Amino acid sequence: MSFPSDSVGLVTPQKFQFEEPLHLECGRVLPRFELMVETYGTLNADYSNAILICHALSGHHHAAGYHHDDDKKAGWWDACIGPGKAIDTNKFFVVALNNIGGCNGSTGPTSPNPENENRPYGPDFPLVTVRDWVKTQALLSDHLGIQSWYAVIGGSLGGMQALQWSVDYPDRLKNCVIIASAPKLSAQNIAFNEVARQSILSDPDFYHGRYLEHDSYPKRGLILARMVGHITYLSEEAMKQKFGRDLKSGKFMYGFDVEFQVESYLRYQGEQFSRNFDANTYLIMTKALDYFDPSREYEQSLTKAMAQTQCRFLVVSFTTDWRFAPERSQEIVDALITNHKPVTYLDVDAEQGHDSFLFPIPLYVKTLRAFLGGEAHLKSTPQVEIN
């Protein structure tokens, strides 16, 4: 198969092992952990062109390119990562990873627990926070020899990680890009997450999180959780244009099977998601969202938290995003302006809702490209090999 000229093409994930104990915010300790990572582009001689991509709730390390010749879908942010794209792999060395607690190769609930005869962690996997993720990402940076990132970029939950980076490691990034995110969850967002969790926890096949030991899987609960979540990712206008009140068969069937096209879509999305995602991971990810609040250690003041930062910021929101509305991004911008920090803010008129950050919307992509600029360039020799 021939790939598009602006694609990074075939990519091979790498697994990095960390043997030192990892102390987590919850008080638990992981004796060791692994991170699944993909890289695109070439690291230059002075390690100055590295960009870290932080993923959202259902994301992972496969952000761009293809794993196999016959893959029909590219990585989740392929629209923005590649030769000549906004995150230009001709200029930048891009690193994407699957966070701990995930289910795509990094240590998580499906991984063997060395303290329990290598049975899957399941519900025994500790709850992790955004700060824990950023800590592991910093350890990955050390392993790669990258003392300072040219940029740390993320959308949604990924944007929260980028924000945490700027507070916890202010001297280790030059630019921070926070997209469709928030400085902490609202009560409504926590409520959405709780409904999703309860749909999983109440599934008879959940077995208190030990479904793998029972050769079972809480598929119904995970499908429902994804359906609830997916509604919040779309705008009303997008749903109106895509589905309206269109009927699947053209007429009312007067029953409880699928009748409206939007019902069919939600069931399909839930079904597809349930085939590829772990239920315990979903619980962990939503709790990490709930716990996120960088102001917590700064007298509940986001302004005081952002006073620690030293980098440039790009903050992007989308007009129809009601999960993380533009006002939430403006809270971050206001805190930065109060501290006289360099920040560019863009509110993009887009109809796709919260998921807008995944689409190559022209103004959004153009702004991201311009912000990253051309300051970093590859040195001809030597090139750095990552092991």
Curated annotation (Swiss-Prot):
InterPro entries: AB_hydrolase_1, AB_hydrolase_fold, HAT_MetX-like
Main location, first listed in the record: cytoplasm
Active site: S156, D321, H354
Any single biological process term in GO: homoserine metabolic process
Alphabetically ordered keywords of this record: Acyltransferase, Amino-acid biosynthesis, Cytoplasm, Methionine biosynthesis, Transferase
GO cellular component, one term: cytoplasm
Claim: Transferase is one of the keywords in the record: yes
Reaction(s) the record says it catalyses: L-homoserine + succinyl-CoA = O-succinyl-L-homoserine + CoA
Residue numbers binding substrate: R226, D355
EC numbers, comma separated: 2.3.1.46
Annotated pathway: Amino-acid biosynthesis; L-methionine biosynthesis via de novo pathway; O-succinyl-L-homoserine from L-homoserine: step 1/1
Gene Ontology molecular function, alphabetical: homoserine O-acetyltransferase activity; homoserine O-succinyltransferase activity
Subcellular locations according to the entry: Cytoplasm
Domain AB hydrolase-1 intervals: 49-358
The keyword Amino-acid biosynthesis appears for this protein: yes
UniProt-annotated site: Important for acyl-CoA specificity, residues: R323
Activity regulation as described: Requires MetW for activity.
Cited function: Transfers a succinyl group from succinyl-CoA to L-homoserine, forming succinyl-L-homoserine.
Complex and partners: Homodimer.
Homology family: Belongs to the AB hydrolase superfamily. MetX family.
Name of the molecule in the record: Homoserine O-succinyltransferase
Lineage: Bacteria, Pseudomonadati, Pseudomonadota, Gammaproteobacteria, Moraxellales
